[in-house]
Amino acid sequence: MTPLMIRIRQEHRGIAEEVTQLFKDTQEFLSVTTAQRQAQAKEQAENLHQFHKDLEKDTEEFLTDTAKERMAKAKQQAEDLFQFHKEMAENTQEFLSETAKERMAQAQEQARQLREFHQNLEQTTNEFLADTAKERMAQAQEQKQQLHQFRQDLFASIFGTF
């Protein structure tokens, strides 16, 4: 064989060895990369699963806390409303009681004023009637006196003087 052939064979072997080595290196790289990616995917899946569990737990806690807060707030509002209703009823009762007392006092005052007015009217009427009776009595006495004088004068003029 000629040295050129030997050399071509050696180069061919060298290229084949390099291709084989390159193939091995590529396979090893792909194998390592695949293993890394699978490990990374597994880790991401675990992280995602843990995140999902944590999110569910946090959501459940949040909803529970929110429900407790709302229940406490509703109870407080119910208590406040009950207290307001109670105070309103007491205030209304006090108002009605005070109003009834005021109206009773006004009615008593009006009754007193009406009695006083009636008494004054009765007294004034009695005084008026008494004064009128006195005046009429005085007029009647005067008219009687005048009539008596007229009769005497008439008698004297008819029969003469005695």
Swiss-Prot record:
Protein induction: Gas vesicle formation in this filamentous organism is restricted to specialized filaments called hormogonia which differentiate at the tapering ends of trichomes. Transcribed during hormogonia differentiation in red light. Probably part of a gvpA1-gvpA2-gvpC operon. Transcription is maximal after 6 hours, degradation of the larger transcripts (with gvpC) occurs rapidly between 9 and 12 hours or upon a shift to green light. All transcripts disappear between 12 and 24 hours.
Instruction: Answer whether the UniProt record assigns the keyword Cytoplasm to this protein.
Output: no
Entry-linked InterPro entries: Gas-vesicle_GvpC, Gas_vesicle_C_repeat
GO terms (BP aspect): gas vesicle organization
* Superkingdom in the source lineage: Bacteria
Provide the disulphide bond pattern. Answer: none
UniProt KW keywords: Gas vesicle, Repeat
* Cellular component aspect of the GO annotation: gas vesicle
Q: Where is this region: 4 X 33 AA tandem repeats?
A: 19-150
Intracellular or extracellular location(s): Gas vesicle
Instruction: Name the family.
Output: Belongs to the gas vesicle GvpC family.
Write down what this protein is called. Gas vesicle protein C
Q: Which organism is it from?
A: Microchaete diplosiphon (Fremyella diplosiphon)
